[in-house]
């Protein structure tokens, strides 16, 4: 049997040990694993300084039976192509090291695989926001995260799928959070050179500019027999939103639902007044703020004002857009303290 064929056979064994309802599955250290480590050297502020940490992490992973080959991205979209190649090669595991954008690219490569081989995903934090790392309680230091992963288990989780109604070819999977309104505008308008220099502060700077010039147009949010005209919607798969903020705090990565949050106001000053409530996690119950859960949501413009959307902090398209849950769309390697999480089965 060729080595590549053996990898495919072993991967099938790994998948069969992971349950289909999202319950705890196969320990990663049960067999020797052939992994691909996808590193974005431009993510965060690490650059070349991150390479020795990755070498240390690879040694740690090897002690747990995970042999990780390191591949670096060279530009936008590269991580998606590399992840797709990993599925074709029959890899046992893909490890992403980069920011939320890198992670989103890898997710789109794995979830979009055409050969039916579902390769589990793992994460080593390397970006500015690291939303998923926070959600999984992973240390932000790369070797520390590697130590957690070798004792983790593979879980089936749902993904969000965002489809622009007028440009369905631009559909994208997302793992953490999507949104439409001012956050989409900020993501579209942020200075990428500034982001490379100062990280997440670039979004704060762009947000301050948008408060002064954005029109906050209303659009319609339709989900679970609820229809609300809003200036912002957050479509959460995770509790963490970005930076220090948690918005959709009842969201559960292991549940087949979004938590939605909408704001009605069209006033930039009112948005600023929400900041203390956001900082202290007191948005629930605030006038004009709505939370509820759904497995699909449609956002439609009400006039000619463009409303932009983002997924996992990356620009998507203008409304109208449909966001929907796709159960068991991804296999995720989670640390032990998340692996025993109790999951409510969703039909």
Question: For each of these PLM feature ranges, what is it?
Answer:
Residues 215-217, 229-231, 254-259, 293-295:
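A generic structural signal for short beta-strands and their flanking turns/coil linkers
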Residues 42, 55, 62-64, 73, ...:
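Catalytic core of DAGKc-family lipid kinases
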Residues 179, 183, 234-247, 315:
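Glycine-rich phosphate/pyrophosphate-binding beta-alpha loops
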Residues 79, 101-106, 131-132:
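Short glycine/serine/threonine-rich phosphate/pyrophosphate-binding segments
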Residues 247, 252, 262-347:
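ATP/nucleoside-binding phosphotransfer catalytic cores, i.e., glycine-rich phosphate-binding loops
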Residues 2-94, 104, 339, 346-347:
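ATP/NTP phosphate-donor binding region
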Residues 41, 97-99, 124-126, 237:
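Glycine-rich beta-strand-to-loop/alpha-helix junction loops that act as flexible
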Residues 183-186, 228-229, 241-244, 268-272:
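Short acidic/glycine-rich loop or secondary-structure boundary segments that cap or lie
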